[in-house]
């Protein structure tokens, strides 16, 4: 009598043997790729017939590389893979005993199938890579699902806003839609959960990709409504180059222009040369930066910096002119200085009027009144016959003249005080005022532009994705 364990082992061995024979027989009888595609694409298949109304097309994108972002042409170049998925009931082959559940083909077979005819409608240029053959991939699944993949190089538009240049962020767009079919025939949608995938971290010499956003909208055309899938890439500018090549050199140039405050009022030629050279250096640095930028009509952050620096240098030249004017008599003999000072006093004499008492002015008023009456052959009435307002008029005129003399006297005192101010004093206060004002400007400038770098966009997706 056999042991029950051996009976069980014999049974399992026979079962495995029969299963292996069945699998081998099944593989021998399965339909290969050529048989399946020939059977599917026979005369009954019509590539112009829409699989369903509407056909739902799911789209996702793999970003391979961004090669450039240009301010002059306001566009960017990108290499990407675009994937499309849809179902075609005419291509179901599950009942054909296929050897594989999915079959891969090239673009030659793809041209024999119905396609949603999608494209990037806002691209400036687009091309499918050919290295060494056309980079088009087609996979047909046994349940009738199709997957197409194109490796493309595109040039898309960017919405350049340079008000914060070089501390700016730029947004570039690509819009994908079916060129031939409206929403009644083809519905487009992003493939979830990851409609856009970065194959690597995108970093350029002057930009880095920090965010992207996707959106799906319906756009109205004369022929109906179309689904549009838009992806927006957010690039943040790397401003280190501009700090090293623009901001720091201009700071040094402005500081050099302050050296003239310490050279003294007698070194006018050297101070003039220093100020003019600083202004020319600022102009050259400004032109070297903006020559690679578009000619926009608004003020950029770099413009504020450069123009403010030019203003500081120009004000230092004005201070030099004031010092030169104040020290124009320096080095002259004492007698010549005294004569010059006397001439200045004589020029200022025109500012003051004769000091007369109110009684003398009132007497002069009545004398003039009598003379005019005699010239007109008319009798001069006594004072009692004048109206009160007529008697108050000379006193009002006297008051106005006295106020005018007082104002002119104060102005003359200020002029004398300015004349007594020494050029060394002006240089001393300028050496304090200019660095302090420039430091306050720097605090305001960097606080405003560096704290307002963040621009918020709807549906932003962080690039750190699984």
Curated annotation (Swiss-Prot):
Expressed in a subset of cholinergic motor neurons including cholinergic motor neurons in the ventral cord, the retrovesicular ganglion and in head neurons such as the SMD, RMD motor neurons, the AVA and AVE command interneurons and the SAA neurons. Also expressed in a small number of glutamatergic neurons including the pharyngeal neurons MI and M3, the PLM neurons and a pair of neurons in the lateral ganglion. Residues 25-242, 291-304, 449-466 are extracellular. Its main location: membrane. Glycans are attached at residues 32, 102, 143, 211. Keywords: Cell membrane, Chloride, Chloride channel, Disulfide bond, Glycoprotein, Ion channel, Ion transport, Ligand-gated ion channel, Membrane, Signal, Transmembrane, Transmembrane helix, Transport. It is a multi-pass membrane protein. Residues 264-272, 326-427 are cytoplasmic. Disulfide bonds join 158-172. CDD domains: LGIC_ECD_GABAAR, LGIC_TM_anion. It is found in: Cell membrane. InterPro entries: GABAA/Glycine_rcpt, Neur_chan_lig-bd, Neur_chan_lig-bd_sf, Neur_channel, Neuro-gated_channel_TM_sf, Neuro_actylchol_rec, Neurotrans-gated_channel_TM, Neurotransmitter_ion_chnl_CS. Residues 333-352 are annotated as: Disordered. The chain crosses the membrane at residues 243-263, 273-290, 305-325, 428-448. Disruption phenotype: Grossly normal movement. GO terms for biological process: chloride transmembrane transport. Belongs to the ligand-gated ion channel (TC 1.A.9) family. Homopentamer (in vitro). Forms heteropentamers composed of acc-1 and acc-4 or acc-1 and acc-3. Both homopentamers and heteropentamers form functional ion channels. This is Acetylcholine-gated chloride channel subunit acc-1. It comes from Caenorhabditis elegans.
């Amino acid at each position: 009598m056999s042991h029950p364990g051996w009976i069980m082992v014999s049974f399992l061995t026979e079962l495995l043997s029969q299963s292996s024979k069945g699998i081998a027989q099944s593989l021998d009888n399965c339909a290969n790729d050529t048989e399946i595609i020939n059977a599917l694409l026979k005369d009954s298949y019509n590539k112009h017939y829409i699989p369903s109304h509407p056909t739902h097309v799911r789209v996702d994108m793999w970003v391979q590389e961004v090669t450039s972002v240009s301010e002059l042409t306001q566009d960017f170049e990108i290499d990407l893979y675009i994937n499309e998925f849809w179902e075609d009931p005419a291509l179901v082959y599950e009942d054909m005993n296929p050897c594989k559940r999915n079959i891969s083909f090239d673009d030659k077979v793809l041209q024999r199938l119905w396609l949603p005819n999608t494209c990037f409608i806002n691209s400036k240029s687009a091309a499918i890579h050919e290295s060494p053959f056309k980079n088009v991939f087609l996979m047909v699944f046994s349940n009738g699902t199709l997957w197409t993949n194109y490796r493309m190089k595109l040039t898309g538009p960017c919405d350049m806003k340079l008000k914060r240049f070089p501390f700016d962020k730029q947004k570039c767009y690509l819009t994908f839609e079916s060129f031939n079919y409206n929403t009644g025939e083809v519905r487009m949608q992003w493939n979830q959960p990851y409609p856009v995938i970065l194959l690597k971290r995108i970093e350029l010499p002057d930009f880095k990709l920090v965010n992207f956003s996707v959106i799906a909208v319906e756009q109205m055309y004369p022929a109906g409504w179309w689904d549009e899938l838009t992806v927006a890439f957010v690039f943040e500018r790397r401003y280190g180059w501009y700090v090293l090549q623009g901001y720091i050199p201009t700071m040094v140039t402005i500081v050099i222009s302050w050296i003239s405050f310490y050279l003294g009022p007698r070194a006018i030629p050297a101070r003039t040369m220093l100020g003019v050279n600083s202004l020319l250096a600022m102009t050259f640095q400004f032109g070297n930066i903006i020559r690679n930028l578009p000619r926009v009509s608004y003020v950029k952050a770099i413009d504020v910096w450069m123009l403010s620096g030019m203003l500081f240098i120009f004000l230092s030249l004005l201070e030099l002119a004031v010092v030169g004017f104040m020290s124009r008599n320096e080095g002259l003999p004492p007698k010549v200085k005294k004569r010059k000072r006397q001439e200045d006093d004589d020029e200022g004499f025109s500012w003051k009027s004769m000091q007369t008492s109110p009684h003398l002015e009132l007497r002069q008023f009545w004398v003039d009144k009598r003379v005019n009456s005699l010239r007109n052959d008319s009798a001069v009435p006594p004072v009692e016959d004048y109206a009160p307002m007529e008697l108050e008029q000379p006193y009002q005129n006297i008051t106005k003249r006295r106020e005018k003399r007082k104002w002119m006297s104060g102005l003359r005192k200020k002029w004398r005080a300015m004349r007594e101010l020494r050029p060394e004093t002006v240089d001393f206060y300028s050496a304090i005022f200019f660095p302090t004002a420039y430091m306050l400007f720097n605090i305001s400038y960097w606080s405003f532009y560096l704290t307002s770098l963040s621009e918020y966009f709807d549906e932003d997706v962080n690039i750190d994705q699984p």
